[in-house]
Amino acid sequence: MGRGKIEVKRIENNTSRQVTFSKRRSGLMKKTHELSVLCDAQIGLIVFSTKGKLTEYCTPPFSMKQIIDRYVKAKGILPEMENRAGPHADNDQVIKELTRMKEETLNLQLNLQRYKGDDLSTVRFEELTELEKLLDQSLNKVRARKLELLHEQMENLKRTEFMLEKENQEMYHWLMSNQIQRQAEVEHHHQQQVMTELKLVEQQQPLMNEFPFFGEDLHLGTLPLLDTHSYRLQPTQPNLQDPAQIN
């Protein structure tokens, strides 16, 4: 039994259509190459996918341009165009293009002079009115852009100010915590000294109870002064003695 005839129609499913296109394209390229080699034929094949991807084949060593030029000559298209254009068609086209570019350049220069206000003596009232409107629109756009940039700068300054304030607060809290910690360490050290002195006093308390004078400070200022006035010198020489005692 032979194969049944397959109906050729567009494949609706995108994935199936893409897979079929890839397979059939490979088969078509293979058949084209075989035909070119077996039959020594010059073949040019151009295929565009639905997404615009180009696939082409041309019989080596020819290029696609050479094959297309041969096709155009075989169809008689190129001679007809040359006969209709004439030998000076290229020169005329270049002259027209240069003229058009000169006119555009001149118009641009005139418009620039008008925008700058350099030469307005030849400008009509209607043109001046239109120019004024254009300048107003341009000025409004410039002002809007300027305000937008100023707003962005203000937002940046606010963010910077917020970050600096946050850093200052963090630094302040850090300094305060360090100061409190140092103060706590000093107070703890002072308490340790007081506790040490109290322990020493408690250790010396039995001795102080047994010897009341133990631990008292002796100051030279509290000692009784010697009575130097109760003593006087006695002369030992006879001539210095009292005459009444001699008699």
From Swiss-Prot:
Gene Ontology annotations for the cellular component aspect, listed alphabetically: nucleus
SUPFAM superfamilies from the UniProt entry: SRF-like
Record-annotated K-box domain positions: 91-183
Protein's UniProt keywords contain Transcription regulation: yes
Keywords: DNA-binding, Nucleus, Transcription, Transcription regulation
Domain MADS-box: from-to ranges: 1-61
Location(s) in or outside the cell: Nucleus
GO-annotated biological processes: positive regulation of transcription by RNA polymerase II
UniProt xrefs under SMART domains: MADS
Expressed in which tissues: Expressed exclusively in a few inner cell layers of the inner integuments of the ovules.
GO molecular function: DNA-binding transcription factor activity; protein dimerization activity; RNA polymerase II transcription regulatory region sequence-specific DNA binding
Record function comment: Probable transcription factor.
Protein name according to UniProt: MADS-box protein defh21
